[in-house]
Curated annotation (Swiss-Prot):
<dbReference type="GO" id="GO:0016740">
    <property type="term" value="F:transferase activity"/>
</dbReference>
<dbReference type="Pfam" id="PF03947">
    <property type="entry name" value="Ribosomal_L2_C"/>
</dbReference>
<dbReference type="InterPro" id="IPR014722">
    <property type="entry name" value="Rib_uL2_dom2"/>
</dbReference>
<dbReference type="InterPro" id="IPR002171">
    <property type="entry name" value="Ribosomal_uL2"/>
</dbReference>
<feature type="compositionally biased region" description="Basic residues">
    <location>
        <begin position="249"/>
        <end position="262"/>
    </location>
</feature>
<dbReference type="InterPro" id="IPR005880">
    <property type="entry name" value="Ribosomal_uL2_bac/org-type"/>
</dbReference>
<dbReference type="GO" id="GO:0015934">
    <property type="term" value="C:large ribosomal subunit"/>
</dbReference>
<keyword id="KW-0694">RNA-binding</keyword>
<comment type="function">
    <text>One of the primary rRNA binding proteins. Required for association of the 30S and 50S subunits to form the 70S ribosome, for tRNA binding and peptide bond formation. It has been suggested to have peptidyltransferase activity; this is somewhat controversial. Makes several contacts with the 16S rRNA in the 70S ribosome.</text>
</comment>
<comment type="similarity">
    <text>Belongs to the universal ribosomal protein uL2 family.</text>
</comment>
<protein>
    <recommendedName>
        <fullName>Large ribosomal subunit protein uL2</fullName>
    </recommendedName>
</protein>
<feature type="region of interest" description="Disordered">
    <location>
        <begin position="219"/>
        <end position="263"/>
    </location>
</feature>
<dbReference type="InterPro" id="IPR022671">
    <property type="entry name" value="Ribosomal_uL2_CS"/>
</dbReference>
<dbReference type="GO" id="GO:0002181">
    <property type="term" value="P:cytoplasmic translation"/>
</dbReference>
<dbReference type="InterPro" id="IPR012340">
    <property type="entry name" value="NA-bd_OB-fold"/>
</dbReference>
<keyword id="KW-0687">Ribonucleoprotein</keyword>
<dbReference type="GO" id="GO:0003735">
    <property type="term" value="F:structural constituent of ribosome"/>
</dbReference>
Length: 275
């Protein structure tokens, strides 16, 4: 997916780039696989903001994606590669031989007309989903389950891929895109290949308005606030933080502080992430 750069005809266009969408083969989504998507604007069920800087943006429908890949042994043909406004990856529309239609994440190299399948008997081919037990060492995989039958939850964004490094007992060792090395139950499903749309990271929005189209509102610096609103706030003119380490809006240490608190699964992490 090449990236198109604009000529600097205005301040907003000067550093702007967009995807060319050359891989998209179908504009209108499959209506049977759409669901309404209500805007939350970062609020929880009590109406309180739990995620800041969210709101507005273009109206969307949710595309129902098959993360479980549980149609075992039934081949499907790739009917189209589509755009999904809810994720960075492209999605592929599958037509199964029994008549059912489903969306999956479109891996790199998957084209219209290709055949994909799920299950232990599937070939080691891009787009096929198999248990980690059946996948050879060194293979790149994505859409990886953490619990058998719950559906893939890891390695789903554009250009992401994990590598199967080892198998020992009931666990497989994977190197994640972040550099983390962790163990996963060997019967969990994973899809062969790397997620497509590699050039997503090279797209530059260029102006604040494109952020607003995506539903992202402005982020105000703490130093620009009053002292009652942020630990960095206050002072006459531009003032230093006045503390040894930066703090969050709620007084917690910020920037480089570990935020992971799940000791139950620490035993599955062999090496911490590098970035």
């Amino acid at each position: 997916m090449p990236v198109r750069k604009y000529k600097p005809t205005s301040a907003g266009r000067r550093n702007m780039s967009v995807s060319t969408f050359e891989e998209i083969t179908k504009k209108e989504p499959e209506r049977s696989l759409l669901e309404p998507l209500r805007k939350k604007a970062g609020r929880n069920v009590y109406g309180r903001i739990t995620v800041r800087h969210r709101g507005g943006g273009h109206k969307r429908h949710y595309r129902k994606i098959d993360f479980k890949r549980d149609k075992v042994g039934i081949p499907a043909k790739v009917a189209a590669i589509e755009y999904d406004p809810n994720r960075s990856a492209r999605i592929a529309l599958l037509h199964y031989v029994d008549g059912e239609k489903r969306y999956i994440l479109a891996p790199l190299g998957l084209n219209v007309g290709d055949t994909v399948m799920s299950g232990p008997a599937a070939d080691i081919r891009v787009g096929n989903a198999l248990p980690l037990r059946q996948i050879p060492l060194g293979t790149q995989v994505h859409n990886i389950e953490l619990e058998k039958g719950r559906g893939g939850v890891m390695v789903r964004s554009a250009g992401a891929a994990a590598q199967l490094m080892a198998k020992e007992g009931n666990y497989a060792t994977l190197r994640m895109p972040s550099g983390e090395v962790r163990r996963v139950f060997i019967e969990c499903m994973a899809t062969i290949g790397q997620v497509g749309n590699l050039d997503h990271q090279n797209v530059r929005l260029g102006k604040a308005g494109r952020k607003r189209w995506l539903g992202r509102r402005p982020e105000v610096r703490g130093a620009a606030m009053n002292p009652r609103d942020h630990p960095h706030g206050g002072g006459e003119g531009r003032a230093p933080r006045g503390m040894p380490t930066p703090k969050t809006k709620w007084g917690k240490p910020a920037r480089g502080v570990k935020t992971r608190h799940n000791p139950r699964t620490d035993a599955f992490i062999i090496r911490r992430r590098t970035r």
